[in-house]
A protein has these predicted regions:
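P-loop NTPase motor domains
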Residues: 1-337
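P-loop NTPase motor core of the ASCE superfamily
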Residues: 15, 98-105, 109-112, 248-251, ...
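A short beta-strand-to-loop transition that corresponds to the Sensor-1 phosphate-sensing loop
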Residues: 32-34, 342-346, 374-376
């Protein structure tokens, strides 16, 4: 379904007021699950023809040495968006819903603490502290206590010196003594700090029980941090020797850039889907910010700006689709996002998302539907069932023949 010229939008530019002005190009973002080299080459050629190579970004999981870098949780309007983007990819069906809610809360605790420490969240940081929350608890406690009561460390050291296996609470067994001492000090002083309270509640879980309830979160994070992928999704902003650019969606939109996203799904479908969904979730968040505040919000001397047309092309989008894609097609239009999706059959969408109702919701939110060589009956009926019925009053048979020699 929905076929078209994906590279044509590279040349689109808004009308110029004066001939000497540069055209105000449209944003073009192409998601390609397979990472097709021909499509990438075509986009490169069209960007060169349009004079847009300086604003052309290539993100490709199959070529980490050449790929740009991207942090899906590094930019946010509200800190809670970090937890939503991570936990939103977990299953919410049946008994899994409770584990997803806990995962959201725990990731939110980590993200708030990192933000308070001045550390930009990324998947590597989140995984590190999911596995070992104690280090983050101690680090934030050092910052908080040094700012509010530097002499408290003498008391904490005294408490730590008196601890042994007999007087450590059962739920704190297996925790470092420094963690137990800080927890007891904070309980005595009744310190009211939301971030500190969240971390304290996390370390108070029995360690064995805690490991069980975060077990559903670890596979997702390991998919996003294993091997060279970690370099792309958790970029080191302080490494000045790395020539690979780092981009985010707001930067792309403000620069009217062109982005090619190759997810290398033939090599690893699970990682491709996880990365694609995280990008969609981030883009939905940016669209919400643009809808409320405009594109240039926060820039010096900026005024309320109009919408920028954002052309989003998702090839074989059934490979990428998830709950994050639904608000993209039914709400992001208010921020200027125009989604063009390409797939073969409706069954592909339904099989991926696991719900016929959600599949119908996604398809129903597209304004236009184009079909070419459709083989599945259910897919063809998406078009034929919308055609009006007419009455045929007369039917006239006709036949003819031509002499090929005379013509």
């Amino acid at each position: 379904m929905k076929m078209g010229r994906r590279t044509q939008t590279v040349h689109h530019g808004y009308r110029r007021r004066r001939a000497e002005e540069q055209p105000d190009y449209e944003v073009v973002i192409v998601f390609d699950p397979k990472g097709d080299a021909d499509l990438l080459k075509r986009m490169y050629v069209e960007c060169e023809r349009a004079g847009r190579l300086d604003e052309f970004y290539v993100f490709h999981l199959g070529h980490p040495d050449l790929s740009a870098r991207y942090n899906a949780v590094g930019r946010f309007g509200r800190i809670s968006e970090v937890a939503t983007r991570v936990a939103g990819q977990l299953s919410g069906e049946g008994n899994s819903a409770a584990f997803r809610e806990f995962a959201w809360r725990f990731v939110n605790i980590i993200a708030r603490a990192l933000h308070a420490l001045g550390i930009r969240p990324d998947y590597q940081q989140i995984l590190r502290h999911v596995v070992n929350i104690d280090a983050l608890f101690v680090e934030y406690a050092q910052k908080y206590i040094s700012e509010h009561d530097p002499r408290a460390w003498d008391t904490i050291i005294q408490i730590e010196g008196k601890l042994n296996d007999k007087n450590i609470p059962f739920n704190m067994k297996g925790r470092p003594l420094r963690v137990v001492a800080i927890d007891q000090y904070l309980t005595q002083k009744r310190i009211a700090d939301p971030v500190m309270e969240g971390l304290k509640s996390a370390v108070r879980y029995d360690k064995t029980y805690f490991d069980k309830i975060v077990a559903s979160l670890l596979p997702l994070l390991e998919k996003l941090t294993t091997g060279r992928i970690s370099e792309l999704l958790s970029p080191n902003y302080a490494d000045l020797n790395d020539p690979r650019p780092i981009f985010d969606w707001m930067q792309v939109i403000r620069k009217r850039a062109v982005v090619y996203v190759g997810l290398d799904a033939l090599s690893d479908t699970e990682v491709a889907a996880a990365v694609g969904n995280s990008m969609f979730s981030d883009l939905v968040s940016v669209a919400g910010h643009i809808y409320k505040h405009g594109v240039d919000d926060g820039l010096p001397g900026s005024l309320a700006s109009g919408k920028v047309r954002i052309n989003l092309h998702a090839d074989e989008f059934n490979e990428l689709i998830g709950d994050e894609f639904i608000p993209m097609v039914n709400k992001a239009g208010g921020a200027g996002v125009q989604v063009t999706a390409y797939t073969q059959t409706m069954s592909d969408i339904e099989a991926k998302i696991g719900s016929r109702a959600k599949a119908g919701q996604i398809i129903g939110n597209f304004n236009n539907l184009f079909m070419l060589r459709v083989r599945e009956t259910a897919t063809a009926e998406l078009l034929t069932n919308q055609l009006p019925k007419v009455q045929i009053y007369t039917s006239t048979p006709a036949s003819g023949a031509n002499d090929a020699i005379n013509n």
